[in-house]
Amino acid sequence: MKVKARTFSGTTSNEVTQREIANRALARKAATEGFVLLKNEGHFLPAPKGGKIALYGAGAVKTIKGGTGSGDVNERDYVTIAQGMKNAGYEVTTEGWLDSYVKVYDQAREDWKAAILKKAEKMESPNAFFEAYSSTPFFMPCGEKIDVDAAKADGADTAVFVMARIAGENKDRFDKEGDYFISEEERVLLAQVCESYKDVVLVINTGGLMDLAFADAFDNIRSIVQYVQAGQEGGNAFADVFTGAVTPSGKMTDTWAKTYNDYPGAEVYSYKSGDLTKERYEEGIFVGYRYFDTFLVPVRYGFGYGMSYTDFVITAGKVSVSNPGTMDPKVSVEVTVKNTGDTYAGKEVVQIYVSCPQGELVKEFRRLAGFGKTKLLAPGEEQHMTITFPLYQLASYSEDQAAWILEPGKYGIWVGNELNTSVLSGALELDQEAVMVQCENICPLKEELKEIMPFAKKVQARELAWHEELKAKGIVPVAVKAADIPTEKVDYQKIPEVLPGRAGEIVEQMSEEQLVQMATGDPGKDQGNALGSAGISVPGSAAETPLVAAEEPWNVASIALADGPAGLRLKKEYQVENGRIVPTDFLSALEGGFFAASKEKRGTSYYQYCTAIPVGTLLAQTWNLDLVRELGEMIGHEMELFGITLWLAPGMNIHRNPLCGRNFEYYSEDPLLAGMMAASMTLGVQKVPGCGTTIKHYACNNQEDNRMGSDSILSERTLREIYLKGFEIAIKDAQPMSIMTSYNLINGVHAANCYDTCTRAARDEWGFAGAIMTDWTTTNVQIQGECTAAGCMRAGNDMVMPGMEEDHENIRKELKEGTLDIRELKRCIYNTVNIILQSNQYEEAVSYENQFDGLGEWLTVK
């Protein structure tokens, strides 16, 4: 195999390329499909094109395109909502207010910068700056009050008010004014806007949810748009939806509660419990809509909710079960969707929920089992769809049996365009219990945990009610026989005596020291151990694998890894002098170089402009798997262009609580939706030869405060059904090249050192074939317990990132003492080398997905 010759990444030309233009157009399309229209009183939107418009709020001119930290992208430029409205032909009447806001904002940013630098000086951590930065969130200033009389006379009837919030890794949000709640200054400003203009459109430019009770007090807020954070083309995309050039089709991927305290465990989440060392998952499986729907708690906007400019009628048809007697029985639901409006074309999302029988295992009232998005339907046009999903999607986990089981009884099938209004449309009936997968128990609890449960009588009454509804509708359940459902028995593997293939040959030829070096990344002598910018050959990349086996007979290339998940995070400009890259520090790669000291440029400049796509939550709100797959392929081609092999994305943890600082990176409160989005993104990226994704953060990364020392305490059933399920789906449906473990502990064991999740679940149960890596500095910053590099090797966590000499010392020490078996080390290096040999660093690279059968078939729509 021939390793590609290394060249400097990017281009010496600063001209906008056709690649940038095309990719921005796709990012814009994705944003338009992800915006959720929450309110549209009197069909106020779409608004007439052109004319005068008033813009207020922090996000109008300082629109937040994405979150902070490793999820940020250093794009060429981005379009604010204000610029997008101007591009659409509107005359903005509030230029004076916007200009004054920019000055207020810029000063606030400088003050924030100074506070962080001062805080970092007092810290002794090797990652002092990043810790100071990520633990000191920037709160958007409100802006000045307005002159009501002047505003009334500015000629605009409509005002757009953009609420904005910033969040990022290492710090959870606050349930206080100015964050989850509207600040008093914002309330006063909004009241002035509502007094000054006839009609107001409220835009929510946040990475997560916020309390919207304030909106009820203003009668002339006609429309509310959930904008989230829409990437670099967000402003243009908003104008597309505002004017009706695109009909909104986004749907909520979370439940928007009436009040924060309605969320289960709200009062003890993260810092609110007073103990950041333990996070007790007492809500069990009742997360998000599973809680609200089961416990009958009223909500503001339900899971799957979203309005359109047109109307649709969804008619459910035949329900069937296929592939009996195989390991993959399927359920299919036929649906017809018709656009019954007379003006606007639009897309609709069909959602299928299932009520599983309440037997020995108490279950949620309904769970998402399948979904599909229509094509663009003209007025009067209809589309016939068959949505097919695995029967396994309806299985529940029994800890007593250590098995995924289907309990006997009726399985009600609900069809609609959101959870709360879905209609009981069909059913299955299983004659007796079926064991679908026989496993072994993993991640046992080490202390007592009492989970909430619904009242048994209410559960039984609701189940009886929908059984009676089936009879009243004349629906005859489709009979399913347990005898037609074979049991898959997991074969838990031992380390093979002989490692297979070319990768095995190479590993067996390596010296012990080469193996030790290959167990970590190579941070680079010039870059230090900076979080997220330890790459050498591709400036701004997160890390590289070492070159200790680059010569014959091994010929193992070094691969570069880049952060995400809203696009590739690289330095958009770097310099080359005398044939060498001029070294820069971490600050130059953060927030577009905002924190870096000004330096004179030396040598020739190279440019790496990557596309900033919408954040994960907004992508999931599209409910469009084909579109996400197309975005993945786009990112794969950018990886190919800049020499990146592994994209450290997608992020796919569950939205357990709206205050999690990193929710913007993740998709949903539902594991099926999260898993399918990650699978689709992976299938797109990995279509490009030698490129791969890194699904993260595995697992239970549901809070950011004390993320390296927090112990997620939860039952095995909750772990498997909610927090591992999305990863399971992504692996089985897309086979990502790699997985990144999380910082936290799971029932007392560090995720990076957890054999149960890294090996028994991912590899033995789900068939994962790629490499696993730690998150950055997992083994170097200890808060609770000890997480070691040797512990990673024992667990089957193959790459310690970004790689430090102390990691090598730890591995050498444990090999010498016999607490680490050389075969355990070789197994990990084999997994890494196996991926490297299939990377885009070789001339002969092909699509990684080619070697697997049955990918992309978990959920199909025809």
What residue spans do the PLM features occupy?
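Short beta-strand elements
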Residues: T421-Q438
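Extracellular/periplasmic metallocenter environments
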Residues: A402
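Glycoside hydrolase catalytic-domain context in secreted enzymes
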Residues: M1-S396, I405-L419, Q438-K862
